[in-house]
Amino acid sequence: MPAQKIDGKLIAQQVRQHVKSHVESIVSSGKRPPGLAVVLVGSDAASHVYVTNKRRACEEVGFVSKSYDLPSTTSQQKLLELIDTLNADEEIDGILVQLPLPAGLDKEQVLERILPHKDVDGFHPYNIGRLAQRIPALRPCTPKGIMTLIESTKRPIKGLDAVIVGASNIVGRPMFMELLLAGCTVTSCHKFTKDLQSHVERADLIVVAVGISAFIPGEWIKPGAIVIDVGINRQTDGTLIGDVDYATAEKRAGWITPVPGGVGPMTVASLIENTLEAYVKYHSN
């Protein structure tokens, strides 16, 4: 029996609709809507697409979206000064600096300059630390979205053997903490892991985020497992495929995310959720 497809597009639309309804209630009570500032430095084509999607999502739910498109020659100091200005702006609840930044700019310093309660990407060390201490505040967007996808399966995950392939700061590491918080027994696999196959084959739940086309053979997937494929890899013919061999994995898994239309839409939906949360928890008074 083929796996049930986890429809990220549908679930993301449901999240956005929920946020939109909340914003309409806020505005009808006479309060200002939430505000998100999006900062883009340089002319990276993929970044422009991502930023456009984020701005469109903001407008759809009724946020005020402010855009700051800066040239690739922008200095570190000018970028930090802009963040300081946005930190002080009482009508801005979230600040998003689109990554990657052009060469010569210090990403860590930039991200740490954003006030933790305006860090709607969830990358600030304070927010990562809160997640590690089991008291999450603003959570990293992609792992948060993945948890929403997993919850949609209705399968209890407490006690499951969960395996994460990939240990990036954006997905793998915070994903480990999310699944640990949810009660899974979690294994983190990375480029130094020996016998990756044995880890994957025992996983009741697997999250793959390495950016390599069909890196995980479908034959490795445990029957009935939940498979979350974070990879988005463009092929020479223009098609997009994930990090898991979908055609074979789909025949073995219990649930699986497609590529595209799985994890990707949830990252933006989680950003929208975080912006509303920042407004409600930290700025609405």
From Swiss-Prot:
Residues the entry annotates as binding NADP(+): 166-168, 232
E.C. no: 1.5.1.5, 3.5.4.9
Gene Ontology CC terms: cytosol
Alphabetical UniProt keywords: Amino-acid biosynthesis, Histidine biosynthesis, Hydrolase, Methionine biosynthesis, Multifunctional enzyme, NADP, One-carbon metabolism, Oxidoreductase, Purine biosynthesis
Keyword Oxidoreductase attributed: yes
UniProt signal peptide: none
GO molecular function, one term: methenyltetrahydrofolate cyclohydrolase activity
Any GO BP: tetrahydrofolate interconversion
Coiled coil: none
Catalyses which reaction(s): (6R)-5,10-methylene-5,6,7,8-tetrahydrofolate + NADP(+) = (6R)-5,10-methenyltetrahydrofolate + NADPH; (6R)-5,10-methenyltetrahydrofolate + H2O = (6R)-10-formyltetrahydrofolate + H(+)
Record bears the keyword Ribosomal protein: no
Superkingdom as given in the UniProt entry: Bacteria
Subunit structure: Homodimer.
Family stated for the protein in its record: Belongs to the tetrahydrofolate dehydrogenase/cyclohydrolase family.
Biological role: Catalyzes the oxidation of 5,10-methylenetetrahydrofolate to 5,10-methenyltetrahydrofolate and then the hydrolysis of 5,10-methenyltetrahydrofolate to 10-formyltetrahydrofolate.
HAMAP family associated with the record: THF_DHG_CYH
Protein name from the UniProt record: Bifunctional protein FolD
Gene: folD
